[in-house]
Amino acid sequence: LPILEMKRMVNVLFAGVLAMTVLSCGEEKKGYTLNGEISDVKDGMVYLKKYQDKSFIAVDSAVITDGTFKFEGVCTEPLAYGLTTFRDSKRPLVFFLDNEKMQLKMNESEKILTVTGSAINDLYAQNAPLTRQDGYSIDSLVAVHPASAVTPYFIVKDFAYKLNLEEMKALRAKLDASLDETMYVSQIDGFIKRMEDIQVGAVAPDFTLPDVDGNPVTLSGLRGKYVLIDFWASWC
């Protein structure tokens, strides 16, 4: 090939590689950065805990140096997390983790956590103290913020066991479709399914348990007979 033609081919190839590099960089997931200050602990450890299945589970930790700490990572969706200096603490200071650069100031002994740089945390901070008050209506939050991850979180955490089936379905129908695949909305769907399964007139959920002789007995195998089922809590 003539030298001029070869140069043209090299330039085209280089431009293609450069374009692919730019595109791949643009597709990189944006992560979160938490820059924290803690006023009641100078040095030690701080634990990041994820709210899951009605409890907080430690997923990361950072060293506290001269009252400051830092977390970095990527989250797949905005979810509730907690911060604590006690690894086994069941009541960390709660905030919403999103892929943003956030500034945190905390004092665990006084139960104070302020978060700046995240709009979702502004909404969480506004509503967290209200949802525990008598007379708070979750309907108003759903009506005003149907697309915020904060809304289904409060439904799951504070209202799932207070609402009947029709009330839960009504709230679910008002949530924005963009939340359909998120963790908290999936949990709401699970609550609705379980409530539907135990409505009067519905077929009872099947289960198998050993009888007094240790033989397995399945509820569906007793269909057509009079059956008395006695349930009690595991801690009784």
Where are these regions (language model features)?
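Bacterial Sec-dependent N-terminal signal peptides
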Residues: L1-G36
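A non-transmembrane, solvent-exposed segment enriched in polar/low-complexity residues
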Residues: C25-H145
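Helix-turn-helix repeat elements of alpha-solenoid scaffolds
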Residues: R132-G135, K162-K169
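Alpha-helical repeat scaffolds
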Residues: I138, E167-L175, V203-D206
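N-terminal "domain-start" segment that seeds a small globular fold
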Residues: S140, S186-S220
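Short solvent-exposed coil/turn linkers within tandem alpha-helical repeat scaffolds
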Residues: H145-S148, Y161, S178-V185
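Short active-site neighborhood of thiol/selenol oxidoreductases, capturing the structured segment around
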Residues: T218-C236
